[in-house]
Regions:
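Acidic, divalent-metal-binding catalytic cores of TOPRIM
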Residues: 1-224
């Protein structure tokens, strides 16, 4: 994902809608949620050894290059398949905000690294997902467009009344460094979402979760 709060939003949405996605999450007898997919945790160690930034979309470009050997990166995908004699089974999914046209991380990734065709771009727009390499389970996943918007960030999947919520006299700002006298940022917004996930409307997330579930289900069926 592009940002650390993106993963948290997804987890909150899955917790609310867990009965619809048994391949992605389940709830045990004690009421504890168990995620059946793993979310990549960025760290200083990953940054030191592999050059992956702690935030933003650049880390996913770096990961993609380790699958392809592009831009001078080592092709770890082929290397480990060769030395283990096993093919990759579980999908690796790169989640981007749906900002194909503007100068944002997704457009840069598509133009500078993935180099997809216009036909593939249309497939991505229609299905919200695209297999990036023919012989792998590396996928690109993007957020759905909402309310007739030409582009969409993951926060746009929340209902407008939630995005307009006032907390302690402050309104929500998506900026990295909001004016703290007037606005609260993504961290506080997420804490509110997590605390109140049972009452929050996650309907806007369903197309994204459906696409994610489709990738997982298809990869699972291809290995059985």
């Amino acid at each position: 994902t592009e940002g650390k709060t993106d993963v948290r939003y997804l987890k909150a949405a899955l917790m609310k809608l867990y009965t619809q996605y048994p391949s992605l999450i389940e709830k045990d007898d004690t009421g504890r949620f168990i995620f059946k997919i793993k979310f990549f945790q960025r760290s200083k160690r990953w940054k030191y050894f592999f050059g992956m930034s702690l935030d933003g979309g650049d880390a996913m470009k770096v990961l993609y290059r380790y699958f392809t050997g592009k831009k001078g990166a080592k092709d770890y995908f082929s290397y480990f398949q060769r030395i283990t004699g096993r093919r990759q089974l579980s999908p690796v999914i790169l989640l981007y905000d749906n900002e194909i046209e503007s100068k944002k991380p997704l457009k840069a990734f598509l133009n500078e690294d993935a180099g997809i065709t216009e036909l593939q771009k249309q497939e991505l727009k229609n299905n919200l997902q695209l297999r990036l390499l023919p012989d792998s389970t590396l996928f690109l996943l993007i957020t759905p467009l909402t309310a007739g918007k030409a582009e969409c960030e993951i926060e746009d999947l929340f209902a407008p009344d939630l995005l307009g919520l006032t907390l302690d006299g402050k309104t929500f700002s998506r900026k990295d460094k909001p004016n703290k006298d007037k606005h609260y940022g993504k961290e506080i917004f997420f804490e509110y979402v997590l605390t109140n996930y049972q009452s929050i409307d996650f309907q806007g997330f369903i197309p994204l979760l459906d696409a994610l579930n489709s990738i997982v289900e298809n990869c699972k069926s291809s290995t059985t």
